[in-house]
């Protein structure tokens, strides 16, 4: 049965203060994607007001549509009277000075005739997109009861051919909606596996030169970078600890590939796995008590979990399906582990419980890999490679398994999504 939320969200010009209300829809008890939402704009006095209100309305509509919880109507469809039983977002702005505008809104329940929320914000015109994301977060928070992720970012490897048809790889970062793309490296060296720090202020990545591996931290605020550590051999698959104090890495040297913990303060390393097995792709649980990783301890590549609260710290195998398993990533909620599965020449992105139960495959393809979680714990971004010259980023949701491509101007791979 289609769910309608009897709410109207008006953006007015007369509310100079903030208040809050506690009302939300329990999505666990609702039909996902069936919350009716109409996004429209009010008549504006100036050309600037009209242009920016339309832009902000478009950002809000796109954000809430893409999150998979709302059935969003825009344009002519939004002008019909069917919105009376849907949630309505009406965008309007007022110019305060040459470059400053005021955006205010109230949340109104048409069923109970009760005002639920009033807010107002003054912002420079250049920040209109950020304001659109902010309003999207507020709507998501009030209607769903969960913090929105619309002011987060995506990092990935951008790859294209230069004039000599040589592959050039750069670290890229962009807003979650694909806007404001920036390249953090210039393509003069091989780079791999960018990963956000827990606070989102930095990105760590690996660079290789002269037979050595360099772990580099990029400061996103001032664009400076520093070498955290240098290793002989090959380092791969860096992953921050949830508290941001250490890194998990995979290190290959002398015929062994083991997982190390690197303390970011002392720069000291500690071996977590030992032996001749190839162990890689480590990922902490959110509480930092467990670590998932892939290894061929049993003879084939499988998923394992180490319990750090257990003195023995013996790896426990959790994958028992046919095929090989790789790149485990713990969800931000701690309830699932995403992974790549390779079976009979096909690749799959799937999830399972931390104990290995309830395995579900969400997507399949010629070559799909490198899953990373969105902050909401309900969607996964991954790499889909159709050919050596065609790799793109895709999203898949856990409930309906709907997929959509994330637009990038070049080939893209190895994504990571910042948390709140």
UniProtKB/Swiss-Prot annotation:
First-listed, main subcellular location of the protein, grouped into a coarse class: periplasm
One Gene Ontology CC term in the entry: periplasmic space
Compartments (UniProt record): Periplasm
Domain of life: Bacteria
UniProt cross-references to SUPFAM superfamilies, sorted A to Z: TolB, N-terminal domain, Tricorn protease N-terminal domain
Matches recorded under InterPro entries: 6-blade_b-propeller_TolB-like (IPR011042), PD40 (IPR011659), Tol-Pal_TolB (IPR014167), TolB_N (IPR007195)
Pfam families associated with the record: PD40, TolB_N
Entry's Gene Ontology BP terms: cell division; protein import
Signal is among the record's keywords: yes
Keywords: Cell cycle, Cell division, Periplasm, Signal
Cleaved signal peptide residues: 1-21
Biological function: Part of the Tol-Pal system, which plays a role in outer membrane invagination during cell division and is important for maintaining outer membrane integrity.
Summary of subunit composition and partner proteins: The Tol-Pal system is composed of five core proteins: the inner membrane proteins TolA, TolQ and TolR, the periplasmic protein TolB and the outer membrane protein Pal. They form a network linking the inner and outer membranes and the peptidoglycan layer.
Similarity section: Belongs to the TolB family.
Descriptive protein name: Tol-Pal system protein TolB
